[in-house]
């Protein structure tokens, strides 16, 4: 029996995706959706325990399988987005694409999702039929969570920041290497 929206999850085993899965479990989100787990490297393998009707991993490159989802949440990275997203939209899929990668951030129909900072923008886009929801740069998002109100009040003109994005974007092994260098 289907429960809620069919939500495809891609990139759920990586650094960003595994944190998302932990958060979704803790908040009971899997009770409200019908999750389908996709993989770029292990299609046909066993899906995680949160799977309901689909107990096997689907191929993350299979456009027909992806089209069955009302929502796709991907933490797989920009190369995946660039390879799959245009084909999926060209196939006529009208579902919601939620993406942690930067690949679509500058598209005209993309909405950066950081609800504590821009909830009115998100709500307006949703009311207009928006369906491309893109995560912001992690460093900038964290910064805006802390100082966004100061920007809105005109008390901050600009800010400069540094990041280890190149390492985190490379995955868990690169982060371990970086942390080992710190001692």
Where are these regions (language model features)?
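N-terminal Rossmann-like NAD(P) cofactor-binding subdomain of oxidoreductases
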Residues: 1-183
